[in-house]
A protein has these predicted regions:
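Substrate-binding/charge-relay-adjacent region of secreted/lumenal peptidase catalytic domains
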Residues: 1-4, 9-248
Length: 248
């Protein structure tokens, strides 16, 4: 149970949950998906889940928004696009850089008129950025990007990694760690003096929810962001197709 009592973690066997929630969990074989539309291939997998909606007694059902964790299916995926080799960066003390033919934090700062803030010395000092991700993150990757690609000065030890529910495992491009790197690198470049807390969780529905509950309970981050998931348009279409629970 989290301090706010809004997220309650329950433990038990599959049979106990089947009995308590009136469901029947089964094993499902997910076929492999070949590469298509610029997205990499997905390997075949075996997952567990249930086709039935969980049931709760009428005395407590109105207070429960959703029951998560009856499946370990991981539908979220990251599809990063790699920058071609040979790009160059300029050596500058400002939180910016220049690539050839690619958008950068400097472009974001210009388009959203952040440069006046930098000139006034507002660079995130004393603030904390929170990033939620579902793939392993290595702080050394972001530090290399800031120091050797953007050539900006950042504070030592500015990144804290919080493994929610045991974490997602070791960093892996296949699992989407490139997306984790991107989130931290870009936000940290725009606010070079801010601290960063990375909440990394297993790639499951309950892992995603627990990461946000953990961040809210700790109340350390001044802002919290995540690039995992789908847009509202896609989510609503999934709900209409009974592929997604509207409560989730």
């Amino acid at each position: 149970t989290y301090p706010d009592d809004l997220d309650v973690v329950a433990n038990g066997t599959a049979g106990e949950f089947d009995s308590a929630l009136n469901v029947q969990q089964q094993q499902y074989d997910i076929p492999a998906v070949p590469a298509h539309d610029g997205m990499g291939p997905t390997a075949a997998a075996q997952v567990h889940g249930t086709a039935q909606e969980p049931y709760l007694p009428a005395s407590i059902a109105p207070a429960v928004l959703a029951i998560l964790g009856l499946t370990n299916y991981a539908p979220f995926a990251a599809h990063p696009t790699h920058t071609p080799k040979g790009v160059t960066s300029s050596n500058s003390p400002a939180p910016t850089t220049t690539y050839t033919g690619n958008l950068t934090p400097a472009d974001f700062a210009t388009n959203y008129d952040l440069n006046p803030l930098y000139r006034d010395g507002i660079t995130g000092k004393g603030e904390t950025l929170g990033v939620v991700t579902l793939a392993g993150f290595d702080p050394a990757t972001a530090e290399y990007f800031w120091n050797n690609v953007l050539h900006i000065t950042t504070g030592a030890g500015r990144i804290t990694v919080d493994n929610v529910d045991g974490g997602p495992g070791a960093p892996s491009e296949k699992a989407g760690s490139g997306e984790s790197d991107l989130d931290v690198e870009q936000s940290g470049a725009l606010a070079p003096d801010a601290s960063i807390v990375v909440y990394q969780a297993p790639n499951t529905d309950y892992g995603f929810a627990d990461a946000f509950f953990t961040a809210a309970s700790q109340n350390l981050a001044d802002t919290l962001s995540s690039s995992w998931g789908e847009s509202e348009t896609i989510l609503l279409a999934s709900v209409d197709a009974d592929q997604e629970d509207p409560a989730y």
